[in-house]
A protein has these predicted regions:
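A Zn2+-metalloprotease active-site environment signal
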Residues: 2-8, 15-266
Length: 266
């Protein structure tokens, strides 16, 4: 049993070391067990299915704004990566920007550069700069490979559960089940959700820089998230949420602004 525990621990350690990458700008180390090519292929498939089930907006002005902001931020991202000799990280990207008809207040960017904005968020973005806040944030999630990291965390969580199960194999059945249940809750609250909040904060920071490089004033982010805060309903406590609280997010954005403003050219 002891040898098995050591063996599993070594496997997990090897995975963490070998499949470790670095997030641009923040320098945070992240685990990435799944090749970008596989992530992108899955992303493109899901994106195609989503479009088949959705209605694209016919508002030419709004559609034009979404595509314009998207292309501007795309160029900013490519410029940053080119200047830092990191263009290989954008290999396989097939950028696309669409506006879909939906009352949902939402937007997202799938790995590989597939961006969708919902018409329901436009009243809150108000203008092109507000939209750049949202699109910069969502594109930053993809650029930082947060989706791949989340999937990798899920795989590690499964491996960790297997390791604990082996370690407790000599314990009574009831005791083992209790431990495994506790492990599941502990992993979700203690590890998985905090990473989600880290992703959100990281996307805020990168998004501010990308929108600034694209020519949009990053100071508009404070106003946008203030509007989002007022529009939101009851929220769970921050420690059980995948997003930072509104107060935390706005405070963090204010801390990130001096850095982002260094990239801003009117």
């Amino acid at each position: 049993m002891k040898k098995t525990k050591i063996y599993l621990s070594l496997i997990l350690l090897a995975l963490l070391v070998y499949y470790c990458s670095t997030v641009p700008i923040t320098g945070r180390k992240q685990i990435s067990l799944i090749p970008a090519s596989e992530i992108n292929a899955l992303s493109f498939q899901q994106y195609g299915e989503f479009l088949k089930q959705s209605k694209l907006s016919e508002d030419k002005e709004a559609v034009g704004m979404v595509k314009r902001v998207g292309v501007n931020i795309q160029k900013a991202v490519e410029s940053y990566f080119s200047q830092n000799n990191m263009m290989n990280q954008l290999q396989g990207y097939e950028w696309e920007f669409n506006l879909v008809e939906s009352d949902e207040v939402n937007a997202w960017c799938m790995p590989g550069g597939k961006v969708v904005v919902y018409t329901g968020i436009l009243p809150l973005t108000k203008d092109e700069t507000g939209l750049a806040v949202v699109m910069g944030h969502e594109i930053a999630h993809a650029i930082a490979q947060h989706g791949a990291e989340r999937m990798s965390q899920g795989l590690l969580q499964q491996l960790g559960g297997m390791a604990l199960s082996v370690a407790l194999q000599n314990e009574p059945e009831a005791t083992r089940n209790i431990f495994l249940a506790a492990y599941g809750v502990g992993t979700t609250v203690g590890v998985m959700l905090p990473f989600s909040r880290t992703h959100e904060s990281e996307a805020d920071r990168l998004g501010l820089i990308f929108m600034a490089m694209a020519g949009y004033n990053p100071e508009a982010a404070v106003d946008f998230w203030t509007r989002m805060s007022k529009a939101g309903g009851a929220k769970p406590p921050e420690w059980l949420s995948t997003h930072p609280s509104d107060e935390t997010r706005i405070a963090d954005i204010k801390k990130y602004l001096p850095e982002a403003l260094g990239y801003y050219k009117k």
